[in-house]
Curated annotation (Swiss-Prot):
MF (Gene Ontology): calcium ion binding; hormone activity; hydroxyapatite binding; structural constituent of bone
Domain of life assignment: Eukaryota
The name this protein goes by in its record: Osteocalcin
Post-translational modification summary for this protein: Gamma-carboxyglutamate residues are formed by vitamin K dependent carboxylation by GGCX. These residues are essential for the binding of calcium.
Main location: secreted
TM stretches of this protein: none
Organism, scientific name: Xiphias gladius (Swordfish)
Gene: bglap
4-carboxyglutamate: modified positions: 13, 17, 20
Family: Belongs to the osteocalcin/matrix Gla protein family.
Disulfide bond residue pairs: 19-25
One GO BP: regulation of cellular response to insulin stimulus
């Protein structure tokens, strides 16, 4: 599984930019973290 520590700051920012367009994903990111939220809404991270 991908963890935040496995990604560069630029990759994390890319995930945030996608996730913040979806209110539900953005809210989940605030509580569960950006990686968990992105995977829940968009599937595996493709970097």
């Amino acid at each position: 599984a991908t963890r935040a520590g496995d990604l560069t700051p630029l990759q994390l920012e890319s995930l945030r930019e996608v996730c913040e367009l979806n209110v539900s994903c953005d809210e989940m990111a605030d509580t569960a973290g950006i990686v968990a939220a992105y995977i829940a809404y968009y599937g595996p991270i493709q970097f």
